[in-house]
Amino acid sequence: MHQIYSSDVSSITSKSSIAKAEIITMEEEQQRQSCCTWFHSLKVQIWIAWLGVSAGVMAGTVFAIQYQNWIAVTMCFISSGFATLVLHLHLAYKKTQMAGWSETRLRCLAAVGATVSFLSFIAMVFCLVVAGIEHQTLDKQGLMGANLWIAAVWFFMTSKWSALTWRFARKYRAFCEESQPLLAAAPPEYSVTI
């Protein structure tokens, strides 16, 4: 039984129960037609993570070779690293390899993601304020060297991917807690001596 996300009434059936209430269910074979449901599917999330990895690597290469903006280059590659972590979490969940992971590993990933997200957001705000005060430009000449407008964009991207690392590490940790048995090992045998 699925929750209904679309307003398409033709795909639902109603069944009456004993208390004269109606239960609305969707058939298992029918596809949901909501954009929100499509966007949050695991396949789409994997593609978005791949896009984040490739965008970080390509942008880092361009900013290193053409503009020599080393702050942006560093943040591009850090952002790509967090996108890789998100991709790894999704693929491990999809391949059901996450069942053997310890809760501590996912807690550490979540803590690192939350910390880096917070620090990157503060750095983004700092870059925006300083770039505005110094009247940095976005023309060809202004982009050469340490341009804080571009650095702010990549601090934001790092903040986003590290926040997604935090979010999915917490989500998959809850999944691991549900899937693990209450007793990982057999209980110790009790011996009674008379």
From Swiss-Prot:
Heme transporter that regulates intracellular heme availability through the endosomal or lysosomal compartment. The keyword Zinc does not apply. This is Heme transporter hrg-1. One of its GO terms (cellular component) is lysosomal membrane. Coiled coil: none annotated. It comes from Caenorhabditis elegans. The chain crosses the membrane at residues 45-65, 71-91, 113-133, 143-163. The keyword Transport applies. The gene is hrg-1.
